[in-house]
Amino acid sequence: HRSLTHAYSAKTKEEHEVWKKSLRDRLWEITGMNKCVYCEPDAQYLRTDRINDLIAEYWGIKTEPEIEMPFYLLRPEQQNPDCKQKKHPILIVPHGHGGGKESTIQSQTKFIRDALEDGFLVVCPDERGSGDRREFPEQGEEPEKIRMNSHRELLQVCIGFGQSVIGMAVWDLMRLADYLLALSESNGFLACAGMSGGGQQTVWFSAMDDRVKAAITSGYFYGFKESLIELPQNCACNFVPHMFETADMGELGALIAPRPFFVESGEKDGLNGKSGLNNVTTQLDVTRKAYHIFNENTYPIHSIHSGGHQWVGTGMRTFLIKAMEKE
């Protein structure tokens, strides 16, 4: 399984940069991101909602000429009128499976509230096929419908065009970053954090875009063989043509080096695969090779909790604060 076209083998910074460009170019192609079409965001404010006592502005941007991405924008000064900060770091929190942007705020309220207290603009978007972007078979406001996604339908169609669900998701996050970093209230620091499918989006987005200055993934960092090839019942968004010939999770992590990177794992998380945490740590060992080339020994941070497939969050707030100080 390690006979990969882009297995990590760099020994110097120069070799790392050559490898990084080569793998990114290959991922740009096999994910179908090269088929996406750029357009201006044409941002639209729609309304303001209150979720778990947090004030959330509902916005939308265009990520392709006929593709719209809705997101919630939460501002520190709306939660705390005493906030005098004029420029803010930005934290994108992609959702996992089982809901959209609303579920992010509902399930990660403390993390989001802490980030707002620390001055972040917090942004919770809908991924293609989820939330307000579900295709017609899954549309509806019933709880069971809201928890569904259309990733299988999307993959079945987009694979015929040489595209993938994760490729489209990363493209959308890149276009969202374009818009957010251009805001007058942005201070230029961008972080991304997600659980499960949100962790997947975070890892891939951070691997493909150096503008992400700090990345947090929970419940998504493990070797592909045990967690995807041997567990093919996982969501269709995990699968990219030729990926299993190209690179493994450790290589995706190496693309993030030397930026601050935080991985949270549950001891009992079944998605880790049959060897459990060993399927996580062996991939992190690959990632650490890249960090060591840059003499970076602090990252990646690996936080392990005793639970299953769940977000715990211990140490994440401190991680983000230190990452900002590093900049």
Q: In which residue ranges do the predicted regions lie?
A:
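C-terminal catalytic histidine-bearing segment of alpha/beta-hydrolase fold enzymes
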Residues: D285-E327
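Mobile cap/lid helix-loop segments that gate and shape the active-site cleft of serine hydrolases
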Residues: R152-E153, V157-Q163, R175, V212-A254, ...
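Conserved strand-to-loop "acid loop" that flanks and positions the catalytic carboxylate
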Residues: A257-G276, S306
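N-terminal cap/lid segment of alpha/beta-hydrolase-fold proteins
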Residues: E29-K86
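Short glycine-enriched nucleophile-adjacent loop
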Residues: L173, G199-D210
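Active-site loop->helix "elbow" adjoining a glycine-rich segment at hydrolase catalytic centers
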Residues: V165, S196-Q200
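Alpha/beta-hydrolase fold nucleophile elbow
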Residues: E185-S196
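Cap/lid segment of the alpha/beta-hydrolase catalytic domain
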Residues: K84-K87, I92-A182, E226-E230
